[in-house]
Amino acid sequence: MADFRTVTYGAEFHRLLQRVAGHAPDAELAAARLALAEGRVGDVARAVGTITAAAGLAPTDEEFALLAAAEPESVTDLSDTRPGQWPMPAVDFQPTAPADAGLFAPEAPPPLLDLTAVPYEFVAAVTDETDQRAVEAMSRVPGARALWRAWRLSDPRDTPARVFVLAADVPGADLPVVAALLQAETGAAVEAYAPGDELPAYQVQARGAAALLWADEEAYGIGIARVFDGVDPVTGPWFAPGHPVLDGAERDRVGRYLEGGRPVLMTTQRMADVVEPARGAVVPMSYRTDGVWVWTDTVTYYLRTHGLAPDPELLAHVRGREFRAPVVDDVAEHRTLAALFRPAAAGPVGVR
């Protein structure tokens, strides 16, 4: 580890290794990441050239020039590829190992998990020593912000592969070293990025179907806003005659806050307007969040169209923030989605 160092164009080569992830054996990619952290840029260029040629991938003109400058022979076999030819690897990810599926019975395993807000017994059941070493390493990884773990599934005949996704608030040139540090600690694949980076689809998919193992911000409860005052098993949802109403400037300010939430689950489905059924199925149902509360566009519709106030606790929260919506980071978005899909096996802790 003492030999790790930053290099010129380290951020660009790190990005290239992110782009080829999933198109090469993990051991081959791990060797290339180690080479980059050790400053062996020529070896990295050769590895990327070999991977892209074998997979039929086409680097951009800028990437081609970067490879050629580092190692001219690395681009020898890339002349037959078409610009922009870069399909997504045929892989799937899930937050727990396939062998752990029985822990969630009779439910199906959830699409993602937040293990920072569940009982220790559940965490212990879905993690192992490698995960624990990764979490312990966070105190030694510069700028560590969050750590996810996913299991990658490709061919059903293959053994599931562990993939860590690490968010570290460091300059791009330092990401190869950060990734290599955690890779050395765990022996597993590590996809490192800095918050705000635009990630390739492979890493986005891995993080979006992962278990959040650790975050530098303590876990907190996620509020899930109610829409209606009640639901009749026969006639459906309803609002009470005395449901609070918002008017004037506050109605508009609350509406803008709700509309400005980060989309987390989008749908084109519409439901009927229960206040004016003659309007038909016009009520939107997508989910949004500010990182602390999650609500549906249904809430905003009834506010904008009929003046009906949101869930009292959500409204108090919006007022407490003086109607200024915060930026929702990747960890907050993950925690929100995990609260929506929280399995019974994980218990009720951490949700309002």
Predicted regions and their residues:
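Long, charge-patterned amphipathic interaction tracts in eukaryotic proteins
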Residues: F4, A54-S154
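Alpha-helix N-cap/N′ positions at the starts of helices
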Residues: E12, A24-A27, W293-V294
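Repeat-mediated protein-protein interaction surfaces in helical alpha-solenoids
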Residues: V7-L17, E28, R279-A281
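Long, compositionally biased intrinsically disordered terminal regions
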Residues: G10, P89-D92, F104-E107, L112-A117, ...
